[in-house]
């Protein structure tokens, strides 16, 4: 059997890692061993970050809805309960957008929620 030299594959593998490490400082960019560790850790952080992003945005939406609901005389939990009882099924993302960009529209929703809570 013929001898297989793996220089091409090794160079390709190294180049792939070093390309991913572009923008890092010092040895993390230049030395393959260190760059590989840095890239693996960065990918772990990126994976975790994608999960945290969902939590963070939901938290932000809830904070915005709560602030707008309190301006209209309701707490967040009572507002959401009123929305449920009124049969209004808008998700938190949309409600937060309405709260930020359309105060009058949110006030109308708050009144409907108050009415549903009173009934």
Swiss-Prot record:
The UniProt keywords, alphabetically, are: Ribonucleoprotein, Ribosomal protein, RNA-binding, rRNA-binding
What are the recorded Gene Ontology BP terms?
ribosomal large subunit assembly; translation
Taken from the UniProt record, the cysteine pairs bridged by disulfide bonds within this chain are none
Entries under Pfam families matching the protein: Ribosomal_L20
Instruction: Tell me which domain of life the UniProt entry assigns to the organism this sequence originates from.
Output: Bacteria
Task: Check the record and name the InterPro entries matching this protein.
Answer: Ribosomal_bL20, RIBOSOMAL_L20_CS, Ribosomal_protein_bL20_C
* GO cellular component terms given for this protein: ribonucleoprotein complex; ribosome
Q: What are the recorded GO MF terms, alphabetically?
A: rRNA binding; structural constituent of ribosome
Family, as annotated = Belongs to the bacterial ribosomal protein bL20 family.
> What does the protein in this record do?
Binds directly to 23S ribosomal RNA and is necessary for the in vitro assembly process of the 50S ribosomal subunit. It is not involved in the protein synthesizing functions of that subunit.
Q: What is this protein called?
A: Large ribosomal subunit protein bL20
Species whose genome carries this gene: Xanthomonas campestris pv. campestris (strain B100)
* High-level lineage: Bacteria, Pseudomonadati, Pseudomonadota, Gammaproteobacteria, Lysobacterales
